[in-house]
């Protein structure tokens, strides 16, 4: 309706491959909107009393995904939040559809080349980027794992309400790009400079 101001979404879910900047962009975006930021992986670790790698070691990916699903559902009680999801959180029909119904989903898109550059030093702490002996992948093996995972996950990521390509952008520029994408939805009335 013309002249009627749209309400901002109660929750903004940031999704994308590990290393795309969800945990870096999220707090800055939240500050600009007057929202609170939460990282879903941090919430899972707090509730489990273990790190993500420890959860993977003790129970495998299946146990981790069950805890992740439960933590995602808990965000329904949060208002005025920017929520950084894990790289695989919304790579399932059930979780993606739930997030699409319960907030605005923003996919932070990054090229494979940039992901390899960002993730090479961090592979030691990322179970999905390790071999069967829990050793970090490197070089061509790391690139192949990223390509393989991204190929499967991007089908889900691209269903987000907003897709924001952050390649070549500084963190500040990426925050501005997300804000620009959200403005059409009416979030800008809360924006702080």
Question: Where are the model-predicted features located?
Answer:
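Walker A/P-loop
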Residues: 23
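NTP-dependent small-molecule kinase module
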Residues: 2-7, 32, 117, 138, ...
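ATP-dependent small-molecule kinase phosphotransfer cores
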Residues: 40-100, 122-125, 130-131
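Post-Walker A helix-loop "phosphate-sensing" segment adjacent to the P-loop in P-loop NTPases
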Residues: 31-42
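Hydrophobic anchor at the beta1->P-loop junction of P-loop NTPases
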Residues: 14
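A glycine- and Lys/Arg-enriched "phosphate-lid" helix/loop adjacent to the NTP-binding pocket
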Residues: 101-154
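P-loop (Walker A) phosphate-binding loop of NTP-binding proteins
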Residues: 17
């Amino acid at each position: 309706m013309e002249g009627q101001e749209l309400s901002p979404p109660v929750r903004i879910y940031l999704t994308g491959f590990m290393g795309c900047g969800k945990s870096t962009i999220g707090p800055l975006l939240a500050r600009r909107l007057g929202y609170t930021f939460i990282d879903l992986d941090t919430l899972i670790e707090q509730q489990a009393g273990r790190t993500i790698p420890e959860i993977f070691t003790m129970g495998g990916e299946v146990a981790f995904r069950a805890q992740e699903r439960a933590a995602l559902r808990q965000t329904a009680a949060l208002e005025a939040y920017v929520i950084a999801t894990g790289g695989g959180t919304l790579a399932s029909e059930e979780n993606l559809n739930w997030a699409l119904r319960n907030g605005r989903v923003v996919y932070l898109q990054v090229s494979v080349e940039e992901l390899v550059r960002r993730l090479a030093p961090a592979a030691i702490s990322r179970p999905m980027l390790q071999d069967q002996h829990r050793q970090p992948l490197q070089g061509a093996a790391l690139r192949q794992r990223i390509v393989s995972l991204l190929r499967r996950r991007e089908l889900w990521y691209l269903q987000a309400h907003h897709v924001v390509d952050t390649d070549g952008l500084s963190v500040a520029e990426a925050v501005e790009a997300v804000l620009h994408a959200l403005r059409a939805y009416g979030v800008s009335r809360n924006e702080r400079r």
